[in-house]
Amino acid sequence: TFEIIVVMNGCRDDTREVVEQAAAGNRAVRIIEFTQPLGKGGAIWEGLAVANGNRLAFVDADNMVRAPEAEKLIRALDSHDVAIADRFAGVEEGGTSQPPLRKLISRASRLWVRMFLGLPYADTQCGAKAFRIAAWRRIAPRVLERQADNAQ
C-alpha cells in the first residue's frame, strides 16, 4: 500500500481543486494545507513528518519528473537506502524540458557538485528523492531544516 501526501504551501492558484479532482475517491491521497508559505524545504519536512510506511519519497509538482521516473525512484529502494532522480532522464520520453538558461545553470551546478564536493551523484538538485525509513531517521537529524533542502 502507499499514500500520497500533497502539501499545499500557501498556494494562490487552483492547485487544491486540481488535486481534489485527480484524487476523487482515492483514500490514499491526503492534502495538508498551510495558509502561510513554508518554503519548499518546509513543505517537504511537513509532508515527511506525517508520512507512514517504510519508504518515503517526495517529488516536486513542477512536472520535471514524470510518473515512470518516480516509479523507478521507488523501485531503487529495493537495493539502496536512498535514491535521487535525475531531471534530465526521461526528457526525451515526454518529461518537461527546462528553459535554456535554467538548463545551463542546472548543468553547471551538477558539475560543481561533482568537482568541488566530490559527490558521484548526477543531480543532487533534483526535487525527487526517496528514502528507506531507517535511512531517513539517520539522515534527518543532520539536515539543516528548511535550508538548501535539495543539496543536502
Predicted regions and their residues:
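Conserved donor nucleotide-binding strand/loop of the catalytic core
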Residues: F2-I5, R16-V50
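A general secondary-structure junction signal
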Residues: V6-M8, D86-R87
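A conserved acidic beta->alpha catalytic loop
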Residues: M8-E17, N63
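Acceptor/aglycone-binding surface of glycosyltransferases and processive sugar-polymer synthases
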Residues: F34-V50, R55, A67-R146
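Acidic donor-binding loop at a coil-to-helix junction in glycosyltransferase catalytic cores
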Residues: A148-Q152
